[in-house]
From Swiss-Prot:
It is found in: Plastid, Chloroplast. The gene is matK. Disulfide bonds: none annotated. It comes from Bowiea volubilis (Climbing onion). InterPro entries: Domain_X (IPR024937), Maturase_MatK (IPR002866), Maturase_MatK_N (IPR024942). GO terms for biological process: mRNA processing; RNA splicing; tRNA processing. This is Maturase K. The keyword S-adenosyl-L-methionine does not apply.
Amino acid sequence: MKEFQGYLEKDRSRQQHLLYPLLFQEYIYALAHDHGLNGSIFSEPVEVFGYDNKSSLALVKRLITRIYQQNYLIISVNDSNQNGFVGDNRFFYSHFYSQMISESFAIIVEIPFSPRLVSDFKEKEIPKYHNLRSIHSIFPFLEDKLSHLNYVSDILIPHPIHMEISVQILQCWIQDIPFLHSLRFFLHEYHNSNSLLVTQKKSIHVFLKENKRLFQFLYNSYVFECEFLLVFTRKQSSYLRLTSFGTFLERTLFYGKIEYFICRNYFHRTLWFFKEPFMHYVRYQGKAILASKGTHLMMKKWKYHFVNFWQYYFHFWTQPYRXHINQLSNSFFYFLGYLSXLLRNSSAVRNQMLENSFLIDTVTKKFDTIVPVIFLIGSLSKAKFCTVSGHPISKPIWADLSDSDILDRFGRICRNLSHYHSGSSKKQGLYQIKYILQLSCARTLARKHKSTVRTFLRRLGSELLEEFFMEEEQVLSLIFPQTTPFTLHGSHRERIWYLDIICINDLVNHS
């Protein structure tokens, strides 16, 4: 740990050039083992094979020796392909090494982007309270901002990303060529391995539950690059007109191209480039929304800007259907588990002035959120709580549990959904979801006791289930440490929100 801290205290520019030697340091793999492998599936096989901490250190030394020999990846892949059962030591070695290398790459690649990591090792007093910024803080923000806007674009960020593109993104910040070559070789050799979440097309897919730290970092760097270039092109070229935005896509020569085109085109031409001061961008998971006060033509230009941007810069063949343009006053858009829209309420006020009277029509806008019943029923059907049409069914996999455990599981899901969607203006959809869960719980208990639902409820009493589902659980207040995100291209002065609490229940995340 002291060696690792001393390395971090060096100049940041030197860190970017000296990442490759860290692959041969034992303390890096010790950190990787403590961070990623203690709570993973590899902690159990170590005990099965009779390895302790000293034996794990011997495995690390053997891994470093293989790295020196430059054939550790090929050997690991061959071992994992030939031995497909956990009882084989070679199978365990190959997967242990692959997981260890993946975690080590993740730790090393995060070093240039963690300038404040050194201060985290120092003992300091932790403040008792922080201002939490949860997903629910988005809705007051949207209610305040969207009431003045006209259109919103629902954008699906393209995925999966190609491994070569992710390595090229890292080349903008990391100048250690041997380290990048090792990372590229590691990703390409393991694109078909089951131990790493990489698809057969050599693309990183991060929307799976069991995710690795390295691939999460690569995806986050890709999203950060998209957002940075979006802000960069909008700020630096907002005064350019009748100039193709594809010309200014390469940011390394951006200022030179601006100077060249301005000098060549100094005539009085109407120059513009998506200039829109009233614009808001919000991203969550793999989706984003772009709201604007501009016209429908302006939103279509932004739509095709994104399509060409992903095509020419990230080599994505993106279809236009990934970005939907909706008018806020006429349609709903799905965001963070809610169907949101902008309602217009008109009212007439009679004004009397002396002998004359006249009517004043006032229009007020209200940001409305309703429960997406269809999406929630689809999620419940995938979890085997009901059919696709919303008919409650029993949960056979829970029939072996005790009655209290069954009630507790159903009640926890119901209360979580109730807490999350309690801010909706219309509660009928929420009551329908609660009824489906309540009847599914009753069918599961009746299946366990080999009885009908009516007989079971008559014997147990319907009031018990009713009181159980109506009982409010005390909400736990979570305190998260305040973290400052790394600034890859310098600090942004835009008001960008980084949320601490991002999810409350898996059923909120719809595909």
